[in-house]
């Protein structure tokens, strides 16, 4: 891969640190406080669709669900092989982080009943929104630097639309969607780290020869 296509060395760590801090902050503020749960529930109840509209919107959730996103991520990783195996591996690593992290956190993090009307399991982060973020992360690793801005803007919009759909259907709260965006940051940073791994050794070996 050309040097000019590699990210700045600090960018992966900025993304991973920022995403982790955002994820922790959202959990502590939105899930572990009374005011956070009240705000989350108020937004959910305000935006939640009626039954008739929800039935019409539900098929969209399947069309852009995790299974479809996993297939698209695999295709992006295969396309990444044209730019080198580390690029393909980085795209896959970023996607896996986005796909696995929500499932682990939803099981590991408890949701205390502070302002909820009844005991509820933790739903932070959203797996569906994180699956869309997984595809965005894979693309951000694979595409040339000149296209990353457009992919980032369109991808962020796609995650936002999926998030709005999930809230409208009553499946997730606003904090769940924001947490998925943080997971996306961590996934992107991880993908960039894997992509850039070994590049310094390659450059050194080439110079020595």
Q: Which positions does each model-derived feature cover?
A:
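Cytoplasmic juxtamembrane interface segments
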Residues: 1-12, 170, 198-203
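Membrane-embedded catalytic cores of phosphoryl/pyrophosphoryl-handling enzymes
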Residues: 116-209
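Hydrophobic alpha-helical bundle signature of multipass membrane enzymes
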Residues: 2-119, 140-141
């Amino acid at each position: 891969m050309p040097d000019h296509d590699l990210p700045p060395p600090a960018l992966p760590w900025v993304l991973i640190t920022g995403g982790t801090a955002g994820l922790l902050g959202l959990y502590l503020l939105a899930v572990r406080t009374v005011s956070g749960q009240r705000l989350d529930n108020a937004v959910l109840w305000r935006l939640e669709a009626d039954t008739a509209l929800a039935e019409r919107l539900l098929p969209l959730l399947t069309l852009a669900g995790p299974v479809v996103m996993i297939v698209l991520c695999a295709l992006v990783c295969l396309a990444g092989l044209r730019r080198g195996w580390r690029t393909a591996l980085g795209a896959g690593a970023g996607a896996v982080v986005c796909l696995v992290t929500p499932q682990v956190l939803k099981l590991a993090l408890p949701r205390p009943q502070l302002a909820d009307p009844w005991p509820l399991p933790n739903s932070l982060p959203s797996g569906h929104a994180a699956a869309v973020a997984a595809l965005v992360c894979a693309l951000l690793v694979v595409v040339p630097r000149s296209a990353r801005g457009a992919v980032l803007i369109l991808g962020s919009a796609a995650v936002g639309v999926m998030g709005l759909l999930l809230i409208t259907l009553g499946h997730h709260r606003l904090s769940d969607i924001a947490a998925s965006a943080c997971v996306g940051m961590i996934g992107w940073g991880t993908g960039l780290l894997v992509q850039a791994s070994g590049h310094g050794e390659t450059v050194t070996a080439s110079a020595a020869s």
